[in-house]
C-alpha cells in the first residue's frame, strides 16, 4: 500500500514539474506578442518596419494603442502588453519607482529630439522679457525642455535639480524674464499660436507630417532621454525579446527608416554602426 502511495506521489510530482517546465518554455518561446504605444510616430515605425521582420520569423504581433502615454506602463505591469515603444530610460526609471514596476530597456529606436518651434516668430532673436514658452508637464520631458532653454541663456537651472522629479522650482531667470507655460506634451504643437515658443517632443512633429528640421533649436539628446524598447525585466532572456531587439538593430529596419523622408533629423541607434 505504501509503495503504491509513494509511486502515485512521485508520478504527481513529475507531472506538476513537467507542466511548470512546459509553461516556462512556452513563455520563453511564445510566438504571439502584444506591443503597446502611446501617442506619436513610433507605432508607424513598428507597424511598417518591424512587424514584417517578426512575421517572417513566425511571430503573430498585436499592436495596442493608448490615447495617453500614462496608460502604457500600468498595462505593462499587469501583463496585458509584452513590450512598449514610447519612452526614454529616464522616464521609465521614474515610472518604475512610482508604480513599483520592474521594466528594462532592450534596444534604442530611431527617436525624435525635442525642439523649439514657433508660429509667431521665425527666429530665437525675438526673445525678450515676458516671452512665453510652453513646456511639457511631465518631469522628465520638462527637464529636457528647460535644458534647451538653459543652453540658450534664457533660464538657469539649479545645480541640485533632479530629472524624474524635476519641477519649475528648479528654474531661475537668466538673461530674460521668461514666462513658462506648462502643457500636456501632445497639446504644445497645437497650442503654438497661444505662446511665443513651444518645446515640442519630436514624435509629435513627425506624426503631424512635419519635419524635425523646422525647429528653431534642436536638442542634443542625452542617451538617457533617447527612446527605447521597454519590457518587464523578467522577460529579458526570452527568445521573443531577443528577436524584437534584433529586429530593431537589423539592416532591414535601418534601410526602411533611411528610405522615409519623414524621419530626417531623427537620432539613429548606435547599434546600426555595426550593420
Regions found by a protein language model. Give the residues of each.
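Ligand-binding "clamshell"
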Residues: 94-106, 119-122, 194, 199, ...
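A bilobed periplasmic-binding-protein/Venus flytrap-type ligand-binding module shared by bacterial periplasmic
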Residues: 113-125, 225-238
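Ligand-binding clefts/hinges and TM-proximal coupling segments of bilobed small-molecule sensing domains
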Residues: 139-165, 245-275
Amino acid at each position: 500500500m505504501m509503495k503504491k502511495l509513494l509511486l502515485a506521489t512521485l508520478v504527481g510530482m513529475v507531472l506538476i514539474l513537467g507542466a511548470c517546465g512546459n509553461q516556462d518554455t512556452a513563455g520563453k518561446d511564445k510566438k504571439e506578442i502584444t506591443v503597446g504605444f502611446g501617442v506619436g510616430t513610433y507605432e508607424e515605425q513598428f507597424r511598417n518596419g518591424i512587424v514584417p521582420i517578426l512575421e517572417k520569423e513566425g511571430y503573430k504581433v498585436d499592436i495596442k494603442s493608448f490615447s495617453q502615454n500614462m496608460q502604457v506602463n500600468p498595462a505593462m505591469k499587469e501583463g496585458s502588453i509584452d513590450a512598449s515603444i514610447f519612452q526614454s530610460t529616464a522616464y521609465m526609471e521614474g515610472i518604475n519607482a512610482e508604480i513599483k514596476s520592474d521594466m528594462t530597456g532592450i534596444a534604442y529606436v530611431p527617436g525624435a529630439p525635442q525642439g523649439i518651434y514657433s508660429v509667431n516668430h521665425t527666429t530665437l532673436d525675438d526673445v525678450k522679457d515676458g516671452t512665453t514658452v510652453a513646456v511639457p508637464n511631465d518631469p522628465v520631458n520638462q527637464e529636457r525642455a528647460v535644458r534647451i532653454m538653459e543652453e540658450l541663456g534664457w533660464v538657469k537651472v539649479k545645480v541640485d535639480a533632479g530629472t524624474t522629479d524635476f519641477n519649475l522650482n528648479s528654474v531661475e531667470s537668466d538673461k530674460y524674464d521668461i514666462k513658462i507655460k506648462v502643457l500636456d506634451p501632445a497639446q504644445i504643437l497645437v497650442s503654438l499660436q497661444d505662446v511665443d515658443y513651444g518645446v515640442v517632443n519630436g514624435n509629435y512633429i513627425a506624426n503631424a507630417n512635419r519635419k524635425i528640421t523646422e525647429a528653431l533649436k534642436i536638442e542634443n539628446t542625452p542617451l538617457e532621454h533617447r527612446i527605447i524598447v521597454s519590457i518587464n525585466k523578467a522577460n529579458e532572456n526570452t527568445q521573443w525579446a531577443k528577436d524584437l531587439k534584433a529586429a530593431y538593430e537589423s539592416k532591414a529596419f535601418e534601410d526602411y527608416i533611411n528610405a522615409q523622408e519623414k524621419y530626417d533629423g531623427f537620432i539613429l541607434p548606435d547599434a546600426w554602426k555595426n550593420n
